[in-house]
Amino acid sequence: MKTATYFEQPSPQLTTLYHPDGKTPYPYWNILLRPAGSINASARDMAAYVQFYLNRGAVGGVQVAPAASIDRMETPTRTWEAQEGLKAGYGLSNYTSIHEGFVYHGHNGGVDGGITDMSYLPEYGVGYFYSVNSANGGAFGKIGDAIRAYITRSLTKPPVPAAGELPANAADYAGFYVPAAPRNELTHFLSSGLGLTRVRFDGGKLLLTSLGQFDQPFIPVSGAQFRYVPKKGPAEPIATAMLLRPNAEGRFTYLGGAMVRIPTGLAILQIALTAWFVLAFVAIVVYAPFWTIGGLIKRRRRPAERAMRLWPLIAVLSLVAFVALFVVSGNDAIQRLGNLTVYSIGLFATTVLFALASVASAIALLMARREEIRRFVWWFSILVTASLLIGTAYLAYWGVIGIRTWS
């Protein structure tokens, strides 16, 4: 590989990276953390890199690296599931992925405005590399689908293992799970809630239900390993899920990531509180226009109720602003949130305002004279204020209140 280097290169040798619009350029980003990659290389050199894997470490007939080293790179060993026998997963900068019934090895990557994928089928002797210089994930996915369809057009899919028996202790694993170690700590507060997953067993299958998925089937292969059977498309030919042995940290499953079981009561409470918060959020927004318009009519003004209705609305609007800032920062999140900008300061300010407004809602409720408040408004205020305080406590627990992304 004649051009590959960790170091920043003169601009004439670098391609320009663009936003999803294909017109607005990104500044070049030379990542300093080598475990993350940051290798600059030409497409020709990357093609040679794919060939290096396919030839099991040989280049031009010369064995540069032992074939055993390539095998080791492709083999996960350190994760719990790997130590219990699961072959699919992350090795040494090389992981397995399954597309249309074929098992690929390789790695992808991305920076602002640049996405790439290097994958190969060692058993068939074919592979590919491609990259795009635009943050257009949709186009990137379509290109990858087209390439994989082309290189596998005359290949026979690997056989699918016969269905095995459920482990004798499978019922012990039924229940609710949450991600044990999310990749992104910044959004841990979301994955802890939105990642709630239910595992159950029926008809000799493991059935997985999570947000956006219902009873996704996994077929037992051998031992505690399972292979996924998509409702559309070919079945996966290798096991990619596993029931892990319980340890001092709890009972875990591997379902594309380590999942830890939580008590059913806690899961139900989590679902109920989330539903309560969402309903309160919607109710505050829906109710606001009515009391706002009513406040313009003198005979309908109710000063005693004003603070009880205003503070929850401020809390909700601050949360909306928080989400909007995240969305608007999207394509430039590192630049906008990683520095002291109006976006990062906005996240800090809106979360603090949400907490203060939620507390102010409770104070307004406590200080209100019961006899001056309509019964409906009183109970409405209690329900929405309680939900806002619960939301504040949850976000504070995960460090979201007063978040400083620039530090």
Where in the sequence are the language-model features?
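Charge-dense, low-complexity intrinsically disordered segments
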Residues: 40, 134, 164
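A short acidic/small-residue loop/turn micro-motif
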Residues: 112, 135-137
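Short, surface-exposed loop or secondary-structure junction motifs
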Residues: 1-122, 147
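Short, well-ordered beta-strand elements
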Residues: 106, 117-120, 124-134, 251-255, ...
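Generic short alpha-helical hydrophobic face used as a protein-protein interaction/packing hotspot
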Residues: 50-53, 77, 98, 129, ...
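Flexible, active-site-proximal loop/turn residues at the rims of small-molecule/cofactor binding pockets
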Residues: 55, 136, 183
